[in-house]
Amino acid sequence: ALYDRYEDLFKYKHNNNPESLIAMQWVPLGDWGVCNTLLADLAGNSTMTGGINVWSSYQASIDMLQQYEVGDTIRRNATFCTPGTYYPYICIANGGYTYDGNTSSIKKGVPGGPDDDNDGYIQSMNSPLNTYILRLADVYLTYAEACLGNNEELTGGPGLEALNLVRDRACIPRKKSITFEDIIRERRVEFSMEYCNWYDMVSWYHWRPDYMLNYFQNQHRGYTVD
């Protein structure tokens, strides 16, 4: 079954949870080549990492943030730090952490500092988090896409139910029907910052090139809105 809480998928103590089907198993505090170095490239400030040196300047694009429905705060806040978001499991000794930036920095892949329930396994360029290759939500959404097939709309059946189970965990309303556009959006939101969006886009382009070219040409490329 899907893991109960979406944000828990990206915490060290929840590595190898029942939803994790294939994952890269890094060595906590391991040597170069067997350690997860992404922490320094993802975290935007050292407050979130308990003073550990990090240097990311990556931000969520406007186009990505626009994929989230208004009520989809669970997945959004587990993936990006949006202004005013509170994380009780980061900076635990100080009562939690509230993001006060004016852009949306990366949260997924940033589990906090050494003392934030991470057993001390946080160093610069060294995180204990597994890297997902395949989790059950991917199987569910792939199944939904297969059930939609070449049809314009899917209005029922196990494929729609599979997609709605993913939405249930995010505590957002169920869909009564889905289209190809819904599949794209759901996958982008569910797997944002899990390094699979490019592969999805290439696959979809080979299937529906005209649709995807139009999709690419109408994406918002900026990081700010005037």
Give the label of every model feature segment.
Residues 201, 206-226:
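In a subset of proteins, long, contiguous C-terminal domains/tails are tracked
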Residues 188-204:
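Bilobed periplasmic-binding protein-like "clamshell/Venus-flytrap" ligand-binding domains
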Residues 66-136:
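Flexible, polar/acidic helix-loop-strand segments at domain edges
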Residues 1-40, 102-103, 120-136, 149-161, ...:
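Structured, solvent-exposed acidic/aromatic patches
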Residues 1-95, 213-216:
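An aromatic- and glycine-enriched ligand-binding surface/loop that stacks and positions planar moieties
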Residues 27, 82-85, 149, 168-172, ...:
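Short, well-ordered loop/turn and helix-capping segments at boundaries between secondary-structure elements
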